[in-house]
Design a protein with these regions (language model features):
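A generic structural signal for secondary-structure junctions
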Residues: 83, 109, 122, 222-226, ...
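C-terminal coupling/interaction segments
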Residues: 267-309
């Protein structure tokens, strides 16, 4: 039985290593059947948080409920119901794909049909292949198969597409979307904003051990940044002296002063003023466009870093 319709409920979670507090009292819930993304720069505490939920690391304080179990004391009962796909899965070079599946299946009290699983993950023609002969994308599909061999209710995906080329990453995205259609609960950590926007129903942004935003990608964008972004390009550099109205807005200017990016809650008015200023300065406007802030913009605004830093 899960907690109030949540597959995962975390309350007041803390984890310390000596005097260093890696996780500083976080609270969140993951609903049954949703894909929940955990985003954060390196060292933010997301890996520690996930490992605590998986039962791989003890917590210092707080409570964690995963599918009705406390992973700190009931990990053996929990392991039959979760699947874990790590960022890097290394198997013996001479192990065949079907041998890896048979080995992992032996760890659990319940299994799926392995032949059907291989077919679903487009590995049926690789069942007798040595692990060392597989491509990077095929190895990642094997890692997914190993995480699914016990037909888990909850799947942990730790940066499942890191290091893969764009085409292979797209193939993995499609597989995850198929898993999502099963109404299986998935917790995803990723270093790719576009991956979170495409796959996640909701996301939490964690930084310095604390959750600083949570909601759907659109909710976070609208709640955190209510300003549009105006981007302007001129044939030559903009004047050294900026107008008064620009000083009241948040803006960035390229080193050669040809590219200007302005955040404004009144974009129509700001565009009129910007174009008027450029015209009065005798400059040639070569490009102008307006965009809403992306999840990447929000992430940078909240953490001061890009996700892959």
């Amino acid at each position: 039985m899960t907690n109030n319709g949540n597959a995962i409920t975390v309350e007041g979670l803390r984890k310390s290593y000596g005097d260093f507090e890696a996780v500083r009292g976080i609270d969140f819930g993951v609903r049954e059947g949703e894909v929940f993304g955990l985003l954060g720069p390196n060292g933010a505490g997301k890996t520690t948080t996930v490992e605590i939920m998986e039962g791989l690391r003890p917590r210092t304080a707080g409570s964690v409920d995963v599918l009705g179990y406390d992973p700190g004391v009931q990990v053996n009962a929990l392991k039959d119901r979760i699947g874990v796909c790590l960022q890097a899965t290394n198997l013996p070079e001479k192990m065949r794909v079907h041998e890896a599946l048979d080995l992992f299946a032996a760890f659990y009290s319940r299994n799926v049909d392995r032949n059907q699983l291989l077919k679903r993950l487009q590995l049926d023609d690789k069942r007798d292949e040595y692990y060392s002969k597989l491509s990077g994308g095929q190895k990642q599909r094997v890692a997914l198969a190993l995480a699914l061999v016990n037909d888990p209710q909850l799947l942990f995906l730790d940066e499942p597409t890191t290091g893969l080329d764009p085409q292979v990453r797209l193939e993995i995205h499609k597989l995850i979307e198929e898993l999502k259609s099963d109404r299986r609960t998935i917790l995803l950590t990723t270093h790719y904003i576009e991956e979170a926007e495409r796959l996640c129903d909701r996301v939490a942004i964690i930084d310095a051990g604390k959750i600083i935003a949570i909601g759907t990608p659109r909710e976070i964008q609208e709640r955190t940044l209510d300003k549009s972004i105006i981007e302007i390009e001129c044939a030559t550099g903009l004047p050294e002296e900026t107008p008064v109205f620009l000083g009241e807005l948040k803006f960035t200017l390229s080193e050669d002063r040809r590219h200007l990016s302005v955040k404004s809650s009144q974009p129509a008015r700001s565009i009129v003023e910007l174009v008027k200023w450029i015209d009065q300065s005798g400059l040639e406007l070569t490009d102008i466009h307006l965009k809403r802030p992306t999840l990447e913009d929000v992430f940078i605004e909240l953490t001061g870093k890009r996700l892959r830093e």
